From Swiss-Prot:
May modulate activity of the MtrAB system in controlling homeostasis of the cell wall and cell division. Interacts with MtrB, probably extracytoplasmically via its sensor domain. Residues 1-18 form the signal peptide. The lineage of its organism: Bacteria, Bacillati, Actinomycetota, Actinomycetes, Mycobacteriales. Disruption phenotype: Increased antibiotic susceptibility, altered colony morphology and increased aggregation, increased uptake of the Congo Red stain and increased sensitivity to SDS. Decreased gliding motility and biofilm formation. Cells are very long, sometimes branched and often polyploid. Decreased phosphorylation of MtrA, increased expression of dnaA in early growth stages. A lipid is attached at residue 19 (N-palmitoyl cysteine). This is Lipoprotein LpqB. Belongs to the LpqB lipoprotein family. A lipid is attached at residue 19 (S-diacylglycerol cysteine). It is a lipid-anchor. Its main location: membrane. The gene is lpqB. Pfam families: Germane, Gmad1.
Amino acid sequence: MKRLLTVLVVGLVALVSGCAGIPSSSSPQAIGTVERPAPPSLPKPTPDMDPDVLLREFLKATADPANRHLAARQFLTESASSAWDDAGSALLIDRVVFVETRSTDRVSVSMRADILGSLSDLGVFETGEGALPDPGPIELVKTSGGWRIDRLPNGVFLDWQQFQATYKRYTLYFVDPTGTTVVPDPRYVAVSDPDQLATELVSKLIAGPRPEMERSVRNLLDPPLKLRGPVTRADGGKTGVGRGYGGARIDLENLSASDPHSRQLLAAQLIWTLSRAGVAGPYVINVDGAPLDDRFADGWETSDVAATDPGAAPGAAAGLHALVNGSLVSLDGQRAPRVPGAFGQAPHQVSASVSRNGQDAASVVAPPGAPDPAATLWIGPLGGSTVQAMEGRTLSRPSWSLDQAVWVVADGINVVRAIRDASGTPARIPVDSSAVSSRYPGPISDLQLSRDGTRAAMVIEGQVILAGIEQTQDGRFLLTYPRRLGFGLGNSAVSLSWRTGDDIVVSRTDPEHPVSYVNLDGVNSDAPSRNLVMPVSVVAANPSTVYVADQRGVKQLSASADEENSGWVEVSPLMVPGSLPVLPG
């Protein structure tokens, strides 16, 4: 047998700083199940295709999940198509190398590639890294119609470039356990008819959250509730759904939520999911043939569910605070006076946080040279007196939950909730973080709760780790499903802060990129670095502004700043070395 070794490099998209360009909008399909025509741009096999070209085009075709990957199956022989199991998660690969051994009518190929992430059958994308383990040989045979794949590994390998062209990112919204706000659950779905977008998203809401969120959120659209039919325009038309002034009409049945607050939350899930996907209102929501709420029989608007706005910044009215020379100050124009009460008077405060309602604060006091335990946590109203909640050799920066509990990490390993009873006396309640420590051993140097209180982002030995927050029926709290975000950040993370429910800002030891962003998928990107002086330590963020502490003081970056020309701007009253920004959160 004549052997010819051919090396082909497929897909030249480089992964820059671990950052992947993720598409953000278009209309979806559930992976591998929806029966629709394939997009016209997908490749098809032709009689004159060489084996290497056919394999490359096959990887592109796997990006379309319709009809159990029918577009990709056209590249297979009948027997290979029957044997191929395309169920489950797909691996997203780049920098593919094929090594061929060929004869006249048969080619055997081994595949090497870099893994950039995975895509579950629910459309949940997570970044990854490393080399693709050998999936086994791919065999091609010569047929009357040209070369075809006759043997291939089970599972789906998605070409990264084609994934970017085919899949778009949308966000489903579920309800936090307190019924206060909505919680993002990003999904990636394949492009199809835009008039079916709303139907697909509502169907996904009814199907429920991703597995890691099932015990952290509520879903007011749980079965037995279901759609009576496709989502239409508000007037019942089937085209132009959610575009222009057409609005959207959602007809549901088997509703079990009867109280007004639950119905309001159900509407919030639908409205924020559709609105953030570009499906414009008004939103006519009917259940069992009648309006969900008679007040909105002609349609809901986002303003009707503004209390649950996922983009809102709770406690924003409290404004920016900071620790300057160890005491808490508040920004007042070009002044930064100490706040009244204990927080403004106490020295040696090394970290602090304002409560999410902007009325209370928590700070860690650590006098230099003090004997163990050296750090103490103090909680109280802004402008009032404080009580000591706990102590430890070290205590991390405090973070507030929606139920007014303060979370800290004691001694780098013990996650603790401090919560005050009706009399104001604080209780110290341990959080079960064994799922985190068993997978990511090492001290937790920073822990910050998401604004909806359902997730915790941590810095562990310079890596960004995300975990879900679950409350058991007996009232215990657990950190669950830990996973690493932002592989491109390496081990450079110092501090982090949630900018939104889906976006985390990270300060780093990297002088080229001292501040970066990472989202819930794990995709990271870099913020501007102009005007920052290393080292950059604490970061505090809200949807409108990011604040960091660098060598000279506190600087800010507006979310509306021009990306090409933006630089960090000094917060003049806080330009004191060692000053640390403090926001609600």
